From Swiss-Prot:
Protein name in the entry: Monothiol glutaredoxin-S7
Subcellular location: Cytoplasm; Nucleus
Motif (Responsive for interaction with TGA factors): 99-102
Gene it is expressed from: GRXS7
UniProt binding sites for [2Fe-2S] cluster: 21
PROSITE patterns according to UniProt: GLUTAREDOXIN_2 (PS51354)
UniProt keyword annotations, A-Z: 2Fe-2S, Cytoplasm, Iron, Iron-sulfur, Metal-binding, Nucleus, Redox-active center
Annotated Pfam families: Glutaredoxin
Length: 102
């Protein structure tokens, strides 16, 4: 859990993802299309990916990918991110943490 805290607090936007997950691809594409440069951890490619996935599950993330942290705070998965985007809360949130300047 401490490793997860360190990974998410050092960058303004962190996405935990898997290459094989279509929803992960959708969320990554959304942020890239907005002009944000997220830090992306592909859990199926990195060392200790399974361990990190278990830590995400302990935080209540289900499914465990994609999971988004903005400004070190857990936002949630694809449903939460898309809801924020549709109600126009996502961009102000990204601006507040310095992940988006325009």
């Amino acid at each position: 859990m401490e490793k997860l805290q360190k990974m998410t607090s050092e960058k303004s936007l962190v996405i935990f993802s898997k290459n094989s997950c279509c929803m992960s691809h959708t969320i990554k594409t959304l942020f890239l299309d907005l002009g944000v440069n997220p830090t992306i951890y592909e859990l199926d490619e990195i060392n200790r990916g399974k361990e990190i996935e278990q830590a995400l599950a302990q935080l209540g993330c289900s499914p465990t990918v994609p999971v988004v942290f903005i400004g070190g705070q857990l936002v949630g998965g694809a449903n939460q991110v898309m809801s924020l985007h549709l109600n126009r809360s996502l961009i102000p949130m990204l601006k507040r943490v310095g992940a988006l300047w325009l």
